[in-house]
Every structure is written in C-alpha cells, then in structure tokens.
C-alpha cells in the first residue's frame, strides 16, 4: 500500500507538471483579448473552432472571421487595437507583446491603431504587404479596390515589386491581385468616412 500511494503521489506530481507547462506554453501563445463582438465572429485554432465571445483570448496561429453585418474589436497585447468589419478574415501568424508581429488579412476591412513605442507589425494580404510602425490605418476593400489609408503616422506598401510610402492623410490603391500600388494621394472625405465606418 505504501508503494502504491507513492506511485499515485508521483503520478500526481507528473500531471501537475504537465498542467503547469501547458499553462505556461498557452500564456506564451496569447496574442490578445476580445473587447467587442457584434453579430457572428468565429475563431479557428489548433484545438478549437467556435463562436468568439467578449473577453475571450485569441492565440497566435488563430484564424478569426466575421460574418455578414458583424464586427470585432480586440487588443493585440496591451496597447495595439485591431478592428475588423464584416466578412473579414485574418490569421495571427506571429505576435509578441511590444515586439510586433505578422497578420494575414485574407478578406474584408481592418483598422489597426498601434502606438509608436511598440514593435513593427506586417499585414500580409493577397494584394501586397503593409509594414506598420506607430500608426493608425485602414486596410481593405474601398471603392472597388484594395485600399490602404493612413489616419496618422506612415506606412510602406509593397506589391508586384513596387514599394510606396504612405504618409498621414494619404492613401494608396491596389486595383487587383498582382497590380502595383498607386502613387499615394489624398482620399476624399466621403471615402475616408465610408472606410472607417466599415470597421467601427
């Protein structure tokens, strides 16, 4: 009985160790937390596929999608705000708190608001690459094209071998997959309003 009790005790310690290691590993993979959900928002990850709820955690490697007439607001880390409009789909490829990361934007509109004191974030899409530092910007469908508009700060946009720098108050368009970004230009007030309304 003494030996049996000792084996049970050791097995319990081993399981506890696994649980602690699992908890630490999961904490290392945390990308952010959900602040707002309107309509249907789903998350698909390594071990889950479900509707995403308020205050839930989103992990590195998760794919998050919004349905029709649906929107999402979440924080990446503590300071970077991410908003998705309807019919959007992103995958958080890599993210370290205050060190930046990579997001795949596969569909729909996205708004990113990132302080200057956090690391750079890359937004990859089928249309091109947007490199973000301390910036608030819109990325996604606008006036029938893929648009990038900088509310404040500056970004670089690379597509089809061409890179442009987009300054505050300017935007660039990519007409289709495989096309180059246009020379940055000021967007009209109505276009800006519609773009920002799609993610707020």
Give the ranges of each region predicted by the language model.
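N-terminal secretory signal peptides and thylakoid transit peptides that target proteins
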Residues: 1-21
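Flexible, surface-exposed loop/linker segments and immediately adjacent secondary-structure boundaries
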Residues: 23-63, 67-200
């Amino acid at each position: 009985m003494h030996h049996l009790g000792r084996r049970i005790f050791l097995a319990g310690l081993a399981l506890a160790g696994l649980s602690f290691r699992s908890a630490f590993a999961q904490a290392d993979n945390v990308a952010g937390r959900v602040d707002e959900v309107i309509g249907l928002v789903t998350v698909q990850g390594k071990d889950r596929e479900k509707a995403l709820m308020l205050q839930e955690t989103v992990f590195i490697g998760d794919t998050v999608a919004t349905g029709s007439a649906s929107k999402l607001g979440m924080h990446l880390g503590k300071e970077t705000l991410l908003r998705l409009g309807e019919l959007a789909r992103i995958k958080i490829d890599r993210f370290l708190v205050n060190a930046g990361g990579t997001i795949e934007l596969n569909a729909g509109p996205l708004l990113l608001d990132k302080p200057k004191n956090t690391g750079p974030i890359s937004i990859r899409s089928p249309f091109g690459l947007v490199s973000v530092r301390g910036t608030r910007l819109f990325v996604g469908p606008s006036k029938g094209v893929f648009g990038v508009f900088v509310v404040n700060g500056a970004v670089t946009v690379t597509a089809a071998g061409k890179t442009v720098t987009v300054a505050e108050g300017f935007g660039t368009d990519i007409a289709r997959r495989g096309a180059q970004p246009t020379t940055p230009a000021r967007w009209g007030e109505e276009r800006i309003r519609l773009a920002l309304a799609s993610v707020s």
